[in-house]
């Protein structure tokens, strides 16, 4: 990964981010392709719109169409017929958005699949393994997402758990892919990390 600052003015900046010999201009708008496709658009349309990066979701892709199927295609790029950058979110927010029946522990998050009701365990290691197997360019650590507003005690406890999960995500990165962290500390800037 390489980042170069191209220009800056006061609090603004423009740069270029290169990962896996693919480069995007920053700041960048990430087009959403949660399940590995952008609704109503094919890759030709995306290129016409100068899309440089697509955001997909490891949680959803793991559950449907499934990691094994994406691997059979040779990865998410081949499945999507996309040669630009792909960033996959780890699934922390999606677990949170399921609402009830979620068990969060040091191990990970246990929940029921929104598609078929099966019991699913998502851990930092599983999230990184999925993101590696689908061959994304930029992986996000698995973190806990908490409701807003949350008090200092809840926010600190979640931040500490997410930091432990971040360490495990980093250790699980066996393919040494580009791995990004997520700002922790909720809306309480005094504990942002």
Language-model regions, residue ranges each:
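Intrinsically disordered, low-complexity segments enriched in small residues
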Residues: 139-141, 174-188
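Non-catalytic, usually N-terminal nucleic-acid engagement modules in DNA/RNA processing proteins
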Residues: 1-174
């Amino acid at each position: 990964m390489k980042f170069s600052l191209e220009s800056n003015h006061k609090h603004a900046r423009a740069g270029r981010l290169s990962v896996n010999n693919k480069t995007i201009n920053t700041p960048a708008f990430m087009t959403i392709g949660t399940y590995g496709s952008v609704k109503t658009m094919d890759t030709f349309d995306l290129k016409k719109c100068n899309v440089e990066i697509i955001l997909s979701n490891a949680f959803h892709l793991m559950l449907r169409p499934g990691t094994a199927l994406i691997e059979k295609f040779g990865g998410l790029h081949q499945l999507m017929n996309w040669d630009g950058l792909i960033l996959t979110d780890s699934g922390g927010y999606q677990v949170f958005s399921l609402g009830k029946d979620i068990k969060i522990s040091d191990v990970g998050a246990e929940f029921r699949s929104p598609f078929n009701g099966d019991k699913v365990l998502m851990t930092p290691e599983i999230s990184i393994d999925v993101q590696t197997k689908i061959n994304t360019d930029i992986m996000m650590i698995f973190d806990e997402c908490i409701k807003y507003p949350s008090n200092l005690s809840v926010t600190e406890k979640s931040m500490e758990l997410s930091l432990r999960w971040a360490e495990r995500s980093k250790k699980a990165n066996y393919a040494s892919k580009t791995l990004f962290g997520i700002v922790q500390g909720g809306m309480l800037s005094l504990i942002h990390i």
